[in-house]
Amino acid sequence: MKSFFKPVIIKKFLWTLFFLFIYVLGTKLTLPFVDMSKAAAMDGTSTTLNYATALMGGNLRSMSLFSVGLSPWMSSMLIWQMFAVSKRLGLSKLPLEVQERRRMLLTLVIALIQSVALVLNLPLQEAAGVDMTTIMVLDTLVLMAGTYFLIWLTDLNAAMGLGGSIMIVMASMIAYIPQDIWNSIQELKISSLWLALMLVFSLVFLYLAVTVERSKYRIPVNKINIHNRFKKYSYLDIRLNPAGGMPIMYAMTLVSIPQYFLLIIHFLQPENQLIEQWIEALSMGSPAWFILYLLTIFILALAFAFINISGDQIAERMQKSGEYIENVYPGGATRRYINGLVTYFALVGAFYLILISGLPMMVVLVDIRYLRLSMIPGIFMIFIGMVFSIKDEVEALTLNDRYRSLL
């Protein structure tokens, strides 16, 4: 705990509080020309999009400047990283400025799609001298500007504060999801006994999630020209769940993307019954949505594992620095060995994520009112990963303070 009271940490923490204040202020700035007395005309898709945006720093409840949140930016980052892993495309070899420019263009496209889909289904009210087309264009631009403002805010927080984009997402989750869970408890009229059992289960699950999050498989690595007494401190760590809780957060967002396209098509073809059926079929709580959600978690768990631990890059780095794994030849053999282990633990992590966060949501197929409660395990895993990420950042910033002077 002493690490959190270092001057550098306190300074960064204060900057983060300032940025969070700006974020909260932005969530109170309502979009112009929106009739807030009426619910957004999104039919059964509102629940799906509400939770997807809340997990990405957005907020569809108040229809504010930051309603879209960081979803376009984080989605573009994920898509770029998945393609950058391939050496054939050569994306990782491009200059950093070119990579950043292309990522931001991809963000622009995704932000445009999401903003248009939301605006087309908002209860807009005409103003004197302003036609509806102008109002739609204006609100779309405001939502896109809000997304890019949040990106700029997270960049500032990454440079001057703690947590980067994590803090924005955590603020969004803390602001709305606990209240939603409490509303569900009151709506379902859950007894005190069941609440006590849920609390005990939550504590047990919290312990299990933290244990799995910090569990690692260590591969001893030998370093040439380093004395043997340091050998025991040289390891290549692979986490039991290499992807962490990120697949859960991204899965909710990616599964909601078809909803945005369907909302746009439904606006253009309001009489199309087939589109309405697809919207209902892909709404949260339907069997099709549930299967797509589990499949997305599984695929993302594998993808994030290889994004976080690239056997090609590690093998190349070890070969250049004179490191090698015991009984494994450098180069191709090392790459295959590491990729094999990553594949094994990625599969373990994928099934673990599906078991812990996916299966509890089966109750939603019976009664959609249990949605918020069934999401608690997944939210815990996302939150735990974020907390440990901030903890690791604090430890890295205070690393030099742990050593005593030799003089």
From Swiss-Prot:
GO CC, alphabetical: plasma membrane
Predominant subcellular localization, coarse grouping: membrane
Membrane-topology annotation of the record: Multi-pass membrane protein
Signal sequence bounds: none
Cellular compartments annotated: Cell membrane
Xref: InterPro entries: SecY/SEC61-alpha (IPR002208), SecY2 (IPR014269), SecY_dom_sf (IPR023201)
Keywords: Cell membrane, Membrane, Protein transport, Translocation, Transmembrane, Transmembrane helix, Transport
Spans through the membrane: 13-33, 65-85, 104-124, 133-153, 158-178, 190-210, 248-268, 287-307, 345-365, 370-390
GO biological process: intracellular protein transmembrane transport; protein targeting
Family: Belongs to the SecY/SEC61-alpha family. SecY2 subfamily.
Role summary: Part of the accessory SecA2/SecY2 system specifically required for export of possible cell wall proteins. The central subunit of a protein translocation channel.
Quaternary structure and interacting proteins, as annotated: Component of the accessory SecA2/SecY2 protein translocase complex required to export cell wall proteins. May form heterotrimers with SecE and SecG subunits.
Protein name as catalogued: Accessory Sec system protein translocase subunit SecY2
